[in-house]
């Protein structure tokens, strides 16, 4: 006789109350692409120095629903001249149910930006291509490491602020 997988109402209620996560929407919030030194920049040998800057922010928009914005700025320089400057704000609306604050902070600061990054990377690649520059393939970003470094820095700052001050006698 085959075993049946039965779920009791108590099991279902417990599962429903566990941590929950859902992506409600992913969208591009803002885009900018500049080629301040065109068309002269197209005549130069293409050996750029590429700088990648990342920033994230989150905002509670209603109970347990957050907007996360991942801002990605890519600057390509040829010597002292800017070949292009590409800025993308990739955003998402995420429903994050009740969970411990540490877990929620990780979701907001690492998991959600990690979800958004491939969309931003694709948008940047398309913009660079439309600017007629050689392909730009951004490497994956370790948002877990970035978030861990941020949390360590924040903990060190809080410890420093709470440290008792010594007075010289």
Swiss-Prot record:
UniProt KW keywords: Chaperone, Cytoplasm, Protein transport, Translocation, Transport
Keyword Chaperone attached: yes
Family matches, as InterPro entries: SecB, SecB-like_sf
MF terms (GO), sorted A to Z: unfolded protein binding
GO biological process: protein folding; protein tetramerization; protein transport
PANTHER family: PROTEIN-EXPORT PROTEIN SECB (PTHR36918:SF1), PTHR36918
Protein function: One of the proteins required for the normal export of preproteins out of the cell cytoplasm. It is a molecular chaperone that binds to a subset of precursor proteins, maintaining them in a translocation-competent state. It also specifically binds to its receptor SecA.
Name of the protein this chain belongs to: Protein-export protein SecB
Organism: Pseudoalteromonas atlantica (strain T6c / ATCC BAA-1087)
Gene: secB
